[in-house]
UniProtKB/Swiss-Prot annotation:
Phylogenetic classification of the source organism: Bacteria, Pseudomonadati, Pseudomonadota, Gammaproteobacteria, Legionellales
GO molecular function: metal ion binding; rRNA binding; structural constituent of ribosome
Gene: rpmE
GO cellular component: ribonucleoprotein complex; ribosome
Protein name, UniProt field: Large ribosomal subunit protein bL31
Assembly and oligomerization: Part of the 50S ribosomal subunit.
SUPFAM superfamilies: L28p-like (SSF143800)
């Protein structure tokens, strides 16, 4: 392995939205925040639960709302 070309690898704290925290190795210089981890993911827990995707949907709608409004023709508004 070449010297001085790889980023430093260190321990960082990972925090999930469920409150679970753990340490892992990474090249990041900051803490990492997750929406889902193995402690709350339905596959690992064996429980059915709804995963909140509303945040992603709303972000998508906001992003493309301006394009949709700009491209709307008068015929679209009549329908």
């Amino acid at each position: 392995m070449k010297e001085n070309i790889h980023p430093p690898y260190k321990q960082i704290k990972v925090t999930c939205s469920c409150g679970n925290t753990f340490m892992t190795g990474s090249t990041l210089d900051r803490e990492l925040h997750l929406e889902i981890c193995s402690a709350c993911h339905p596959f690992y827990t064996g429980q059915q639960k709804m995963v909140d995707t509303a945040g992603r949907v709303e972000r998508f709608r906001k992003k493309y709302a301006k394009r949709r409004a700009a491209n709307a023709s008068p015929e679209d508004e009549k329908k």
